[in-house]
Amino acid sequence: MAALRPLVKPKIVKKRTKKFIRHQSDRYVKIKRNWRKPRGIDNRVRRRFKGQILMPNIGYGSNKKTKHMLPSGFRKFLVHNVKELEVLLMCNKSYCAEIAHNVSSKNRKAIVERAAQLAIRITNPNARLRSEENE
């Protein structure tokens, strides 16, 4: 079967691709890079001084049409079993399935086979599937 394609694939425009880093995380090892809002009374990042690192705010949000969209043009739907896969039957042109991390390899095989029958794309079909020669 040919590769499954989305119904429409709009151009995804990100307003910012660089990560927002924590103030002074480049200066000290103990301060991790993960973003934390500065709350100090004299903090220049919080007061938005020129030349300081930028803070995340509502203006950096994505376009409503392309929010949560993968580069392939699909949106992800987390699947734990074959029954949950049936939900995507009518919207297989806009949503793709992603098998949850705690699903056994036996159930993964069943999900992948059923998805092929329903023409549903899976983002991680090869995860935790061992070949026969290794068993």
Swiss-Prot record:
GO terms for molecular function: structural constituent of ribosome. There is a cross-link at K9 (Glycyl lysine isopeptide (Lys-Gly) (interchain with G-Cter in SUMO2)). InterPro entries: Ribosomal_eL32, Ribosomal_eL32_CS, Ribosomal_eL32_sf. Keywords: Cytoplasm, Isopeptide bond, Phosphoprotein, Ribonucleoprotein, Ribosomal protein, Ubl conjugation. It is found in: Cytoplasm. SMART domains: Ribosomal_L32e. It comes from the Eukaryota. The modification Phosphoserine is found at S62. Belongs to the eukaryotic ribosomal protein eL32 family. Component of the large ribosomal subunit. The ribosome is a large ribonucleoprotein complex responsible for the synthesis of proteins in the cell. This is Large ribosomal subunit protein eL32. The gene is RPL32.
